Amino acid sequence: MTGQLVQYGRHRQRRSYARISEVLELPNLIEIQTSSYQWFLDEGLREMFQDISPIEDFTGNLSLEFIDYSLGDPKYPVAESKERDVTYSAPLRVKVRLINKETGEVKDQDVFMGDFPIMTDTGTFIINGAERVIVSQLVRSPSVYFSGKVDKNGKKGFTATVIPNRGAWLEYETDAKDVVYVRIDRTRKLPVTVLLRALGFSSDQEILDLIGENEYLRNTLEKDNTENADKALLEIYERLRPGEPPTVENAKSLLDSRFFDPKRYDLANVGRYKINKKLHIKNRLFNQKLAETLVDPETGEILAEKGQILDRRVLDKVLPYLENGIGFRKLYPNGGVVEDEVELQSIKIYAPSDQEGEQVINVIGNAYVEEAVKNITPSDIIASISYFFNLLHGVGDTDDIDHLGNRRLRSVGELLQNQFRIGLSRMERVVRERMSIQDTNTITPQQLINIRPVIASIKEFFGSSQLSQFMDQTNPLAELTHKRRLSALGPGGLTRERAGMEVRDVHYSHYGRMCPIETPEGPNIGLINSLSSFAKVNRFGFIETPYRRVDPETGKVTPRIDYLTADEEDNYVVAQANALLADDGSFIDDNIIARFRGENTVVPRNRVDYMDVSPKQVVSAATACIPFLENDDSNRALMGANMQRQAVPLMQPESPIVGTGMEYVSGKDSGAAVICRYPGVVERVEAKNIWVRRYEDVDGQQVKGNLDKYSLLKFVRSNQGTCYNQRPIVSVGDEVVKGEILADGPSMEKGELALGRNVMVGFMTWDGYNYEDAIIMSERLVKDDVYTSIHIEEYESEARDTKLGPEEITRDIPNVGEDALRNLDERGIIRIGAEVKDGDLLVGKVTPKGVTELTAEERLLHAIFGEKAREVRDTSLRVPHGGGGIIHDVKVFNREDGDELPPGVNQLVRVYIVQKRKISEGDKMAGRHGNKGVISKILPEEDMPYLPDGTPIDIMLNPLGVPSRMNIGQVLELHMGMAARYLGIHIASPVFDGAREEDVWETLEEAGMSRDAKTVLYDGRTGEPFDNRVSVGIMYMIKLAHMVDDKLHARSTGPYSLVTQQPLGGKAQFGGQRFGEMEVWALEAYGAAYTLQEILTVKSDDVVGRVKTYEAIVKGDNVPEPGVPESFKVLIKELQSLGMDVKILSGDEEEIEMRDLEDDEETKKADGLALSNDEDAADLAPVDLERDAVTKE
């Protein structure tokens, strides 16, 4: 027997074919959400309050500071928040101090700053009762970027951009004449020397001394027509503020506020880190020839001679001295924006681009600006300009903006922080205004602060941001993937239209950080990705992946694990996880396949620095659930990963016989299961609750402590209308540990993800019914409820106050017989358990109609009988088309009972209808390898082909679906599944480290099957064997959310569009099928004149004709002649509105009168046919007409 037994949770053992031992546990898969939000509560909020404090008024004698904050307890627990349609949030209170500097008076006060949405334990938010997820955003990191460009004449040049977190951009570029230009904040370009002069390096000589003598700088100085700092400042001011009269003082303050004011310009922590890293001098000195002698400033010791090459060894020796002051220079700019001294680090080297090797260039670094400085400094600007000139001489590297070292994640915490900042800065403006208006002696912090803008900006973010999404809750895997999603779209990100091929493509730096497989098909491909299984996010927002450290001395793999970002990884050689290791951790082979900067190379074993942790660190959680992934083509694997998220939870879930071992972790971390919070023993188990007696440590002894109650969700509607149901899997007396699964969620079995069912599949054709990927299925799967799922739909009806009086929920509805009311209770609300069909009443409701001027008699009746004479119309809630089922639950909310309802609503009734959907023709099914198809025929069990032992198979798939798609994984799964079924075991075949072909054949032999895994099949109809042996086995098949019940649609009479009077389109509007231009040509080609005329008139927008036709059909008369279609009248009105006098003439030149809609007597009857734009009329249409037709008789 190959493989070894592995335990997954308490209830499942699998035979694992993995050869590589797991050295690292998978992290908690929703940590990206929870830890980011925790950071926001602990530090993010504090940062915001510190940034904005103190707020001072315009005179400077009042100052308001935010000292501390605290979050209270949520008003309702999670379940109740969902039920009441409120936001799950906690009150935020801030301690505010107001200081009056004139009197020295200090006032402290606790100020309520609104309710702040709280993240649930499972990484989601509940906003207005709906569960939402904040998706992490991939954006370009703030930094300085250099890139090469080639102009139209083929000349190579460069561009550079300094991108802040917020603030003005600075861009450098060269032109065809080798002049270096700068653009400030996307304005017109200026020679770069103008910017240097404006900073305070005013003379040509100063600039040449600073940057170093070279032809590019000479060209730029020639182009520059400013002589001193003042002229340069005026020049820049004219570019930034065209049309305003320039003065030197204004120009100074403008430039100062644009770049050196922390409120206007912010690099953030990550920007400062990236700029310091990029402008550090050492990267440009590596392997360059020195043009000066480096001397230790303290001892006078010579560290490196002039003319020496700075290789890795010399550079490592010089590095500590570089950081302690070699090459440091202090500059004293004058007359420009910068008043203080500027510290730089500069070292001279010979330009590698120069053939003679004589040209000396200056390499300038920014002299290690402190991390706390979040805005750009003059030394950053000079160093970036220097880097640009160095690039022109072949020193330095250009950047790849698609590299994950240059893209970072904004997770929940940071997105919230940015939103909160917007709210606070709006509030700051209000506070300043109020400070100057109100009396300074009596004022309190509470009176100054207006929390509206803060609350509004948070509400706006959760309610309408592109990154705040309605959670995909189809099944646990969909939930998990949604929380781990990375989007490049959204505010501050890319747009679909602008994103090119490069951004979407797989990049070598994605390895172990972003899944190369799981991404949507369609316009968002490559812009929305999924986090890899082992990846983490560091404090700067860069994605890190774990590697095993190789000891450089001994060459052995150590137990130490380092998390590396993409740009750190570029410095190391990394071996794959499948490199063979001896017992002591040394590499067995002399040459190892390894990666270095995106190249796969073979290196000697002593060159390896790190090794992969696991073969599945490349892929995401969903992709890691596909067994034999290594045998599938990537395009099909992408579909497989995406379709698992669309699996509908079944009534009887079953985990896969052939799994990957990832099912347990995915189920546990998704948030769908009930997880034990403390170790203990199970005391009581019910369908709805589990009680666990906690174990507590007292003086090293285990003592029984508190009793914890875990509530289970039973038959709740998920966001997608699937059934969310939890089932206990522990028994009384079980000892449980922290983190253990107590109850399965939807699509889970025995603690593992269970999206579909294991069914017996044969690869064969059958009378052409499985043409084009169609699926033939046995009726047994329908009878035994194998693929039956439960769907819950929610309908609501609200009684509002209208201008004519309040609406009323009642059983007393006009023109409705007692039979239709049989299932309503005395309140007029349907009873739980009733079975309803399309069009049945759910909630009886009447709305007052407009009362016209009453006659004297009516007024008398009104006076005698009171309100009764008032006209009401029926606006009851009815079951929509295709919505029939059983009433599962009814919830009633009343304003009188103190329920929070929207303004103007007095009563709200929610009705839940549950449907049990068996699988049927037209439903979509799929395997895990992207092999999807639609059920074309459900055969009786006796007609299905059967095995020699008489077992009929369950599903027939077309063998032609395999070769061209190249997803051979499904065939291996089929064979392995059959062997496992015979052996009575479950299998784990992890991705990239699963069962090899040889293992499959061995397992087949162990199970007593033939090595080709084929078998003779007999035709169920004739009993004859088929000519050839057929591959039959167990495959895991999933029923997808695309069900035929949701898609099938037919219209009788229904609503019409207001202007054209044509039927609406789409199932949701109960619309018709569009008969378009090309369809008209088809009927014309056949000469079907009457059919065509009918379709274009009485079946569409001949208003009078359609009423008469309906009437004729009801009475059994002949159908009348069609009239003029409404759209023709619209066309004429259109032409008349353009000032053309249009007349219609008959064949003998006589004008035809076209009566307008209003004055047409015939259309009075059409009121019943939903010609009004009142939606309720649509439902009543046929009834009214019949009544109308009867009265005419």
From Swiss-Prot:
According to the UniProt entry, its GO molecular function terms are: DNA binding; DNA-directed RNA polymerase activity; ribonucleoside binding
Q: Which residue ranges are recorded for the region named Disordered?
A: 1152-1193
Q: Which InterPro entries does this entry report, sorted A to Z?
A: DNA-dir_RNA_pol_bsu_external_1, DNA-dir_RNA_pol_su2, DNA-dir_RNAP_su2_dom, DNA-dir_RNAP_su2_hyb_sf, RNA_pol_bsu_bac, RNA_pol_bsu_CS, RNA_pol_bsu_protrusion, RNA_pol_Rpb2_2
Which GO cellular component terms, listed alphabetically, does the Swiss-Prot or TrEMBL entry include?
DNA-directed RNA polymerase complex
Q: What class of enzyme is it?
A: transferase
Pfam families in alphabetical order: RNA_pol_Rpb2_1, RNA_pol_Rpb2_2, RNA_pol_Rpb2_3, RNA_pol_Rpb2_45, RNA_pol_Rpb2_6, RNA_pol_Rpb2_7
UniProt keyword Metal-binding, yes or no? no
Which Gene3D superfamilies is this protein grouped with? 2.40.50.100, 2.40.50.150, 3.90.1100.10, DNA-directed RNA polymerase, subunit 2, domain 6, RNA polymerase alpha subunit dimerisation domain, RNA polymerase Rpb2, domain 2
Q: Where is the composition biased (Basic and acidic residues)?
A: 1184-1193
Q: Which domain of life is it from?
A: Bacteria
Catalytic activity, as annotated = RNA(n) + a ribonucleoside 5'-triphosphate = RNA(n+1) + diphosphate
Q: Where is the composition biased (Acidic residues)?
A: 1152-1161
UniProt keyword annotation of Transferase present = yes
- Biological process GO terms, please? DNA-templated transcription
Report the EC code(s) recorded for this entry.
Answer: 2.7.7.6
Keywords for this protein: DNA-directed RNA polymerase, Nucleotidyltransferase, Transcription, Transferase
Q: Which family does it belong to?
A: Belongs to the RNA polymerase beta chain family.
Q: What does this protein do?
A: DNA-dependent RNA polymerase catalyzes the transcription of DNA into RNA using the four ribonucleoside triphosphates as substrates.
Task: Quote the subunit structure annotation.
Answer: The RNAP catalytic core consists of 2 alpha, 1 beta, 1 beta' and 1 omega subunit. When a sigma factor is associated with the core the holoenzyme is formed, which can initiate transcription.
Alphabetized PANTHER family for the sequence: DNA-DIRECTED RNA POLYMERASE I SUBUNIT 2 (PTHR20856)
Protein name as annotated: DNA-directed RNA polymerase subunit beta
Q: Which organism is it from?
A: Bacillus pumilus (strain SAFR-032)
